[in-house]
Amino acid sequence: MFIGRHYRKKRALSLLAVRTTQKARKLLIVMWTPPRNDQQYLNWQWYSSVLSSHAAMCGCPDAVAHFNHLASVLRAPQNPPPPGPQRNLPLRRLPALPAAPEAPGDRAPWPMAGGAEGEEGGAGGDADHGGAAGGPEDADLLDAVAAAET
């Protein structure tokens, strides 16, 4: 009787018949956390995986030099060549806009015009514009602002 080798043929085992126990399910549910998919975390994970794979191959701390060497040896695509001299497009004047199709009498008078022709226009209302400082209320307000600043 030779026991060194198994004489049974190996056959495929379907894992559908293998069921997890209730205890294993509870443990998996407790240990599960939602994935952390923010960009900074993903970048850090990729960076650490690259450094770990480099450390498995080589003991030096310079993974970037090895990537550059592999890129040159394996003829990786290089950066695109710099563009040639930029061609300046000729500047030209734009044509003038066409005149408005309305007649001059169609518009309402300008609100600051001051009234009918012959009257003094441009005053902008009925206020007295003689004094620069305004009325007594404005003087009190200016005094209060000056006192607050000092």
Curated annotation (Swiss-Prot):
<dbReference type="InterPro" id="IPR004118">
    <property type="entry name" value="HEV_TT_vir_Orf2/Gyrovir_Vp2_N"/>
</dbReference>
<dbReference type="Pfam" id="PF02957">
    <property type="entry name" value="TT_ORF2-like"/>
</dbReference>
<feature type="compositionally biased region" description="Low complexity">
    <location>
        <begin position="86"/>
        <end position="103"/>
    </location>
</feature>
<protein>
    <recommendedName>
        <fullName>Uncharacterized ORF2 protein</fullName>
    </recommendedName>
</protein>
<feature type="region of interest" description="Disordered">
    <location>
        <begin position="75"/>
        <end position="150"/>
    </location>
</feature>
